[in-house]
Amino acid sequence: MHIAEGVLSAPVLITGAVVAAAGVAYGLKKIQANHFMLAGLLGAAFFVASLIHVPIGFSSAHLILNGFLGVVLGWAAFPVIFVALLLQAVLFQFGGFTVLGVNTATMGLGALAAYGIFYAIAGKSANKRLKLAGFCGGFSAVLISGILT
């Protein structure tokens, strides 16, 4: 769900950059030192999974994994998503630098929605609600990222 360069107005770009910067800063503050390797591994998975495109009609689709990142990392998903999108912009020209904030905000807010919905349904217990919570969390991440895009 990369937004192309030149499509959005300056106020939208600035708002997206502010939301992304706040999310990245708060995510860096919230991440625990023992989760750095997990965040790096999940960031690499997010980066690679989004490069595998499946043709569908005249377009294509790819895995997003922002819901998974949100459920596992919580707020730390924001900086992970930012780094992955930055690398995609630098290496493959997906998205761009001016829309990096908006792309990070839409993906990061979707990840946070998945985090909130998953833990609201599943709570702290490990029972049958986990399957429903996982589905709802992942579905909401894609839905909210799509709506925000």
Stretches found by the model and what they are:
Residues 51-59, 83-114:
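Interfacial aromatic-anchored transmembrane helix boundaries in multi-pass membrane proteins
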Residues 45-51, 86-92, 142-148:
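Aromatic-anchored segments of alpha-helical transmembrane domains
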